[in-house]
């Protein structure tokens, strides 16, 4: 099946919340039958918090994203969860704009890398809503 996205070549202006932008990136890269919300409680790292060893490639995407946000937070005044940025969705890829090393660009690159990783990783239904106390130590 072919998934047609109206976002395909749209320039997305900065939004007030980074979560909206990250959600749009995810929606652009994942299979049509999935929703971005299905990635919000997956494995040990996709969603709030995170601990233990990632359980698969998709969970590793979230682990890397969490660490990337941790690095971004070291930039003076940078809050990755609320930092907006400029980007473009085009030809099945994502382009981040802005000066290298700035909070906005670093956060955009974190989200871009994670979204593309999601699109290239298998989604295993049994890894959604797992008991993290049991599986993520």
From Swiss-Prot:
Assigned GO CC terms: extracellular region
Classification via CDD domains: PLA2c
GO BP terms, alphabetized: arachidonate secretion; lipid catabolic process; phospholipid metabolic process
UniProt cofactor note: Binds 1 Ca(2+) ion.
Record: active site: 65, 111
Protein's UniProt keywords contain Kinase: no
Tissue specificity: Expressed by the venom gland.
Reactions catalysed: a 1,2-diacyl-sn-glycero-3-phosphocholine + H2O = a 1-acyl-sn-glycero-3-phosphocholine + a fatty acid + H(+)
Pfam family, one: Phospholip_A2_1
SUPFAM superfamilies, sorted: Phospholipase A2, PLA2
Binding site for Ca(2+): 45, 47, 49, 66
PROSITE patterns: PA2_ASP, PA2_HIS
Necessary cofactors: Ca(2+)
Compartments it resides in: Secreted
Coiled-coil intervals: none
Signal peptide as annotated in the record: 1-9
Record GO terms (molecular function): calcium ion binding; calcium-dependent phospholipase A2 activity; phospholipid binding; toxin activity
Transmembrane segments: none
Disulfide-bond pairs as recorded: 44-136, 46-62, 61-117, 68-110, 78-103, 96-108
Propeptide: 10-17
Keywords: Calcium, Disulfide bond, Hydrolase, Lipid degradation, Lipid metabolism, Metal-binding, Neurotoxin, Presynaptic neurotoxin, Secreted, Signal, Toxin
Subunit structure: Heterodimer; disulfide-linked. The A chains have phospholipase A2 activity and the B chains show homology with the basic protease inhibitors.
Family in the record: Belongs to the phospholipase A2 family. Group I subfamily. D49 sub-subfamily.
Function: Snake venom phospholipase A2 (PLA2) that inhibits neuromuscular transmission by blocking acetylcholine release from the nerve termini. PLA2 catalyzes the calcium-dependent hydrolysis of the 2-acyl groups in 3-sn-phosphoglycerides.
Entry protein name: Acidic phospholipase A2 beta-bungarotoxin A6 chain
């Amino acid at each position: 099946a072919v998934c047609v996205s109206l976002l395909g070549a749209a320039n997305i202006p900065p939004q007030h919340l980074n979560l909206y932008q990250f959600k749009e990136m995810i929606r652009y890269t994942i299979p049509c039958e999935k929703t971005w919300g299905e990635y919000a409680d997956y494995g040990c790292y996709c969603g709030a918090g995170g601990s233990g060893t990632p359980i698969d490639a998709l969970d590793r995407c979230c682990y890397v994203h969490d660490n990337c946000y941790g690095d971004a937070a070291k930039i003076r005044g940078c809050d990755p969860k609320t930092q907006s940025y400029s980007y473009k969705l085009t030809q099945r890829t994502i382009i981040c704009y802005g000066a290298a090393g700035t909070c906005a660009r670093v956060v955009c690159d974190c989200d871009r890398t994670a979204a593309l990783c999601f699109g290239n990783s298998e989604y295993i239904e049994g890894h959604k809503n797992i008991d993290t106390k049991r599986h993520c130590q």
